[in-house]
Amino acid sequence: MTYQLRDIKGKVVVITGATSGIGKAAAEQLVEQGGKVVLNARNKARLDEIVAKLGADNAVAVAGDCGDPIVAREIASTALAKFGTIDTIVPNAGIGMYGSILDYSDDEVNRMMRTNYEGTVHVIRACLPTMLAKKEGDIIIVASVAGFRGGGDESIYAGTKHAQVGLAGGLDRELRSKGVRVALVCPAGTETEFAIGAGRTTGSPALAEYLRPDDVAFQIVTIMRQPLSVRSHIWTLWSMQQQS
């Protein structure tokens, strides 16, 4: 018997944090396989560039802070207006900083929680009713291995990612009987603008050992393509050079 993966042609996927790194790579891979993408990030100019590259028939963008519930609802309404449905939600937007818990400003703490956790919650809340109505869909939350065991210099960031882990566990139990699958993708260090902005440089030895955005994006697409009878919940990803 040949194992058949699902065809994702025409599937509509909402992706936050879509102008670089994992989000951008996921959008590109999905469109290559016939998917449609609804992209969100703060930088409108970069979003417009990506939509132009992917094609206006395949992509649409909503610029803004996904931690704002008004923006989250605009993402959902734009998806429905452009493509008529929502099949998958990929909350991927994330920011982080390294340092002692005492080093962060109040604003930095609040921004990490707003983007990493509240943004995840608001986008899911805005898009989920469409999937519940048709009793089918995927929520694929991009968290981090830091959500299971944060390093000594990333306590606040790790806390936001642990919040995503807890959210995913609760949603899995709430939604599996309603046809909506919930998966958690937890990569180790990945070569993204976020990693570079957190104190590393493009030539640093640490980045040479990191995952690539396409590695993580491939897992997102793989989860979508699993038969509807299969529910996979937690994926942790490491490069072969990284220490687990």
Model-predicted segments: where are they?
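Residue(s) in the substrate-gating loop at a strand-loop-helix junction
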Residues: 144
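Conserved glycine-rich cofactor-binding loop
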Residues: 19-20
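Substrate-binding pocket helix/loop in short-chain dehydrogenase/reductase
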Residues: 100-101, 108-110
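Active-site helix of classical SDR
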Residues: 124, 160
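Conserved glycine-rich Rossmann-like NAD(P)H-binding loop of the short-chain dehydrogenase/reductase
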Residues: 33-50
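C-terminal helical subdomain
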Residues: 180, 184-185, 204-243
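The beta1-alpha1 cofactor-binding region of Rossmann-like NAD(H)/NADP(H)-dependent oxidoreductases
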Residues: 44, 63-75, 106
